[in-house]
Amino acid sequence: MGRFSNIITSNKWDEKQNNIGEQSMQELPEDQIEHEMEAIDPSNKTTPYSIDEKQYNTKKKHGSLQGGAIADVNSITNSLTRLQVVSHETDINEDEEEAHYEDKHVKRALKQRHIGMIALGGTIGTGLFVGISTPLSNAGPVGSLIAYIFMGTIVYFVTQSLGEMATFIPVTSSITVFSKRFLSPAFGVSNGYMYWFNWAITYAVEVSVIGQVIEYWTDKVPLAAWIAIFWVIITLMNFFPVKVYGEFEFWVASVKVLAIMGYLIYALIIVCGGSHQGPIGFRYWRNPGAWGPGIISSDKSEGRFLGWVSSLINAAFTYQGTELVGITAGEAANPRKTVPRAINKVVFRIVLFYIMSLFFIGLLVPYNDSRLSASSAVIASSPFVISIQNAGTYALPDIFNAVVLITVVSAANSNVYVGSRVLYSLARTGNAPKQFGYVTRQGVPYLGVVCTAALGLLAFLVVNNNANTAFNWLINISTLAGLCAWLFISLAHIRFMQALKHRGISRDDLPFKAKLMPYGAYYAAFFVTVIIFIQGFQAFCPFKVSEFFTSYISLILLAVVFIGCQIYYKCRFIWKLEDIDIDSDRREIEAIIWEDDEPKNLWEKFWAAVA
């Protein structure tokens, strides 16, 4: 999709190289030697013609450095060995090793339509099609709707923050990289491991649901068998090149989008009287009511409030993955163009897919429907399917349940993809074993895939009589880890904006400027922090060790890793503004000329508008 533009093209550089090559450096006066070296030393970052070693290796690999310039630089370096002139690296073996390591990158093979559709529907899965049953039964249609709207505002600002940073510095697993650069190494490493833990656990959740969705049709095959089969299939899928992942997610996400849009039209018809039930309208908001029974407390108002608070946790789990575009930025072609487009569609995704879907579900399914709170299994079927069954539309429930199955498989596939890229990023920055930075010829971090998939085997926990309890444990652990990532995104963006101001850089000059900032970042950081600490309130009513452990285990692990990093790195709690790095990786992207990928026909224009 692009090519490296020639960084060293100045005639002044070539002329200086040739002059020095013609004259022996020993014959030059000492002051002239110092002057010449200051002008041409590649390690001197103050000269406009200098390049760092990473760029040099890249240029050397692509053959875009002029042969004479390379020879002259080597000649000068060798002739001045006695003067002990030190560059970034002078050891030939280390240079060759670095050049070899530079080849081991993930590939920028995701196009605009891939990024857009992944951001639009890539991680829509269990949280939406299955997980909304719990908040609906606890908080009722109105309570759950308010919870999802409130959480949606937080997610919007989080993605805006991430979009501004990821467009300016598009790197793989930018969520963890930004925490390390703009906050401190301890924040970055702890956030990285927790974010990986989040997606690995979410993979277990998704795989555990697949078999139970299939049980809608038959229960003759053991649940454990379905879990094993799809665990193997999804894990193997992640060994294909990222382009295959992009194509798969593009078409599956397209099915999700079309299915949800079709459901919304269908639901509107049923609400208006298009079934044997007659016009439904707000019938179920009047009886059994707009607010659910609540939880824990016998006091109606208090119980409903607690039910609403618990719905926030389910909403957070449902929205997880909206920030996925920040992970794909490092594998996106022309990220300065593709990432902003995807970010700007987040609000459309929140309103259409989540808010509108929950609104119609609340109209068509009463909160006291027994199928919403089945205790023998996590789900008997999706609330979407229940609403279709209530309308008496034959065959359509089976079709939509098949859509749910495809959706959950897609979401599970994205879980492994994200987790493997997080481990890859940690390895590339020296914060994980270097083996996790190894990739196949197609750019797949295979050890990251294996490690992430291994934790997905926790899905077998649901194969017992306490399946519902195990399922909720996995959701709580995953959700809290995801909330911590959102918090770090907001905090990193706050420091990023402060660093820009410190350098005198206007945000108006950025490739993408987040809306309503910095207020949106402070808003998201504050409420995410509150939710992190109150989300486990049920463990205290009364106090239960097992529930406390599952509610706060992610927070405990985060604290342990953070403190360990502080001790190991002996770093400041947070970087000084003048020490914040906003240049690394950015210059490399700016040196690339991307091909124009504008839509050329009606079909491409349609997908550009949708994705």
From Swiss-Prot:
Q: Name one GO biological process term.
A: basic amino acid transport
Q: Which residues carry this modification: Phosphothreonine?
A: 77, 90
Q: Which residues lie on this side of the membrane: Extracellular?
A: 137-141, 206-223, 275-303, 366-398, 465-473, 533-547
| A Pfam family matched in the record | AA_permease
Bilayer-crossing residues are 116-136, 142-162, 186-205, 224-243, 257-274, 304-321, 345-365, 399-418, 446-464, 474-494, 514-532, 548-566
Question: Is Transmembrane helix given among the entry's keywords?
Answer: yes
Alphabetized UniProt keyword annotations: Amino-acid transport, Isopeptide bond, Membrane, Phosphoprotein, Transmembrane, Transmembrane helix, Transport, Ubl conjugation
InterPro entries xref list: AA-permease/SLC12A_dom (IPR004841), Amino_acid_permease_CS (IPR004840), Amino_acid_permease_fungi (IPR004762), APC_YAT (IPR050524)
User: Which topology term describes how it sits in the membrane?
Assistant: Multi-pass membrane protein
Q: Name one GO molecular function term.
A: amino acid transmembrane transporter activity
Give the modified residues of type Phosphoserine. Answer: 64, 75, 79, 87
Where this protein primarily resides, as one coarse class? membrane
Q: Cellular location of this protein?
A: Membrane
Q: What does this protein do?
A: High-affinity permease for lysine.
Q: Which family does it belong to?
A: Belongs to the amino acid-polyamine-organocation (APC) superfamily. YAT (TC 2.A.3.10) family.
Other information: Present with 2580 molecules/cell in log phase SD medium.
Question: Could you tell me what this protein is called?
Answer: Lysine-specific permease
The organism encoding this protein is Saccharomyces cerevisiae (strain ATCC 204508 / S288c)
Classification lineage: Eukaryota, Fungi, Dikarya, Ascomycota, Saccharomycotina
Q: Which gene encodes it?
A: LYP1
